[in-house]
Amino acid sequence: MMRGGPGTPSALQMLIEALRVLPGVGPKSAQRMAYHLLQHDREGASRLAEALAEAAESIHHCSRCNTFTEQDVCETCLDPRRDASVLCVVETPADQMMIEQTLTYRGQYFVLMGRLSPLDNIGPKEIHLERLLARATDPALGGPCAEVILATNFTSEGEATAHYIGEMLKARGIKVSRLARGVPVGGELEYVDAGTIARAVLDRRQL
């Protein structure tokens, strides 16, 4: 691991390097965060460390939908008021949360935890497509689904992922739909307002 120069404590440099794993945080930003925590908010730094350790220890993936949960099966999958025959496929738990905030969707989810990206060696296995297929078709897991809504992002990789999944599911006779184009091309659900997402879900088109 990279160490600091003369006079730089190794523990500080390790903290800076650790903060750089956050998206959008470069060396300068990580350094500012580290110095702020140590200089102005040591209590906050301790709370952050404890919360991170607790989350890393207790949060794992739902055995049905693959989202984050502290139980074997998440609350959404266990909710009897949800329509288990309709499945919405999203890239991340953050995307799932955005759709939930629209209050327009009452089905269940499957979270890919990514999208197809051959250049990054991310293929069908890495985004759990075997598990998705089982969830959509196996009666023991809530299948067969009456409809699968593809809510991957409208990026080139998200579109390619939606196409791949759509062909896979249609070959099994499952109805597949895609979010309407209210979501901007190149846009990610995490950064789109709830009203736009709600309209995209309601106006979804069959593939």
From Swiss-Prot:
One of its GO terms (molecular function) is DNA binding. Disulfide bonds: none annotated. HAMAP family: RecR. Belongs to the RecR family. It comes from Ralstonia nicotianae (strain ATCC BAA-1114 / GMI1000) (Ralstonia solanacearum). It comes from the Bacteria. Residues 85-184 form the Toprim domain. Pfam families: RecR_C, RecR_HhH, RecR_ZnF, Toprim_4. Keywords: DNA damage, DNA recombination, DNA repair, Metal-binding, Zinc, Zinc-finger. NCBIfam families: recR. One of its GO terms (biological process) is DNA recombination. May play a role in DNA repair. It seems to be involved in an RecBC-independent recombinational process of DNA repair. It may act with RecF and RecO. The keyword Transmembrane helix does not apply. A zinc finger (C4-type) spans 62-77. This is Recombination protein RecR. PANTHER family: RECOMBINATION PROTEIN RECR (PTHR30446:SF0).
